[in-house]
């Protein structure tokens, strides 16, 4: 059974598109469409993994954001305070005059950890976000 292909249009910053084109060239994709389909499949797989996080977990959320984006730093701080019962530590690094890198160390319920991660990753100005967790007992 052949799947119908849908044509879509997207807007990307030229630097991001340039990096993507370089990667798909190195990986040997026949077209941008092949690379984008693979990236979307990877994104869907990651989303499904995040939805399946259960039980007690330890982990980290690493993210890069534009601290000059109006209200973003305050929103990130408010979110972290709301989930302070999960947060054990955080590291904040100023990458340059515009971007910050932060790593938040977590310990608690997996569903809440995933919720915290998703709440932060969708904010406009968060450029990268990666949640990593492992199952653990509560004695950590």
Swiss-Prot record:
One of its GO terms (molecular function) is nickel cation binding. SUPFAM superfamilies: ACT-like, Ribbon-helix-helix. InterPro entries: Acetolactate_synth/TF_NikR_C, ACT-like_dom_sf, Arc_rbn_hlx_hlx, CopG, CopG/NikR_regulator, Ni_resp_reg_NikR, Ribbon_hlx_hlx, TF_NikR_Ni-bd_C. Keywords: DNA-binding, Metal-binding, Nickel, Transcription, Transcription regulation. Pfam families: NikR_C, RHH_1. Coiled coil: none annotated. One of its GO terms (biological process) is regulation of DNA-templated transcription. Ni(2+) binds at residues 81, 92, 94, 100. Its cofactor is Ni(2+). Binds 1 nickel ion per subunit. Belongs to the transcriptional regulatory CopG/NikR family. HAMAP family: NikR (MF_00476). Transcriptional regulator. PANTHER family: NICKEL-RESPONSIVE REGULATOR. This is Putative nickel-responsive regulator 1. It comes from Methanosarcina acetivorans (strain ATCC 35395 / DSM 2834 / JCM 12185 / C2A).
